[in-house]
């Protein structure tokens, strides 16, 4: 009985990155041909996972002429003095900017992925959702395909005009009336 309690306490959870992919031409069978959808794939914790057009280099090939040979990569990491793992994303395309939510990443720029974010480049949209874990051995990636656009207005910052005089409607005033 005591051994069972010890095993339960020391069992590690695996970080899982769920990626929901969308492209306007999603019905084109070859576009996502190299990706196994709706199946979790276990990956060694020290692996760098590449996305791009090059089928020989990229674990997740995106077969479109508008995608760079290697578009971006994802890597698992842990912050100093933290037990849970998370992911970072690095733009490896010299010709395409990569957007994480509304943050623009140029070539070789990298950032930590938020727990839920939108990754965009070209016509591709990828909703990334992280379930953090503490395993030092492996992580999982699960890809899903969306048939509808993932970009919502909530990802686009909107600025509301602020009226100077407290009225919400524009009022014309003749210069001579002041």
Curated annotation (Swiss-Prot):
GO terms for cellular component: cytoplasm. PROSITE patterns: FHA_DOMAIN. One of its GO terms (molecular function) is zf-TRAF domain binding. It is found in: Cytoplasm. The keyword Ribonucleoprotein does not apply. Keywords: Cytoplasm, Immunity, Innate immunity. SUPFAM superfamilies: SMAD/FHA domain (SSF49879). It comes from the Eukaryota. InterPro entries: FHA_dom (IPR000253), SMAD_FHA_dom_sf (IPR008984), TIFA (IPR033621). CDD domains: FHA_TIFA (cd22714). Highly expressed in spleen and moderately expressed in ovary. Interacts with traf6. Belongs to the TIFA family. Adapter molecule that plays a key role in the activation of pro-inflammatory NF-kappa-B signaling following detection of bacterial pathogen-associated molecular pattern metabolites (PAMPs). Promotes activation of an innate immune response by inducing the oligomerization and polyubiquitination of TRAF6, which leads to the activation of TAK1 and IKK through a proteasome-independent mechanism. This is TRAF-interacting protein with FHA domain-containing protein A. It comes from Xenopus laevis (African clawed frog).
């Amino acid at each position: 009985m005591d051994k069972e309690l010890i095993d339960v306490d020391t069992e590690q959870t695996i970080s899982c990155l769920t990626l929901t992919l969308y492209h306007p031409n999603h019905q084109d069978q070859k576009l996502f041909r190299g990706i196994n959808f709706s199946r979790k794939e276990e990956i060694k914790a020290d692996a760098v996972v590449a996305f791009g057009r090059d089928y020989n280099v990229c674990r997740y090939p995106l077969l479109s002429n508008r995608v760079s040979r290697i578009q971006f990569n994802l890597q698992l990491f842990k912050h100093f003095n933290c037990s849970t793992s998370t992911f970072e994303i690095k733009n490896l395309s010299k010709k395409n900017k990569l957007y994480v939510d509304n943050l623009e990443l140029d070539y070789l720029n990298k950032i930590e992925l938020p727990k839920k974010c939108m990754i965009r480049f070209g016509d591709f949209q990828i909703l990334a959702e992280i379930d953090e874990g503490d395993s030092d051995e492996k992580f999982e990636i699960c890809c899903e395909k969306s048939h509808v656009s993932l970009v919502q207005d909530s990802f686009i910052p909107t600025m509301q005009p602020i009226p100077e005089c407290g009225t919400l409607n524009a009022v014309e005033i003749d210069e001579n009336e002041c």
